[in-house]
């Protein structure tokens, strides 16, 4: 039986990754993504730790689709809303423009 918080699926990148150093040595990368669904698309926050976040920032752009694996969590906000956060463990490219990615490197 699998873990109930484990997520794998296709997401669309909505913005540029934002990197931040935590505790003066741990790099985190956050990016808003969209989960394509039949009824209504959902936006969630995707978080990467360490070198994986650097790879996401360097290789992927806005509107690229990636397949991710990771764990989901729910963060409570002040507005009585719940924010879904996915901590990404693995990333696989699906639809992205390799030529423009190589030009930016």
Residue ranges and their predicted role:
Residues 1-105:
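Single-stranded nucleic acid-binding surfaces, predominantly the OB-fold ssDNA-binding core
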């Amino acid at each position: 039986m699998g873990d109930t918080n484990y997520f794998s699926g296709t997401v669309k990148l909505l913005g540029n990754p934002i990197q931040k150093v935590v505790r003066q040595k741990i790099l985190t990368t956050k990016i808003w993504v969209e989960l394509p669904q039949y009824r209504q698309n959902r936006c969630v926050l995707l978080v990467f730790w360490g070198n994986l976040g650097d790879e996401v920032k360097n290789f992927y752009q806005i509107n690229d689709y990636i397949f991710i694996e990771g764990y989901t969590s729910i963060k409570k906000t002040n507005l009585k809303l719940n924010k879904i956060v996915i901590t990404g463990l693995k990333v696989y490219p699906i639809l992205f423009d390799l030529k423009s990615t190589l030009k930016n490197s």
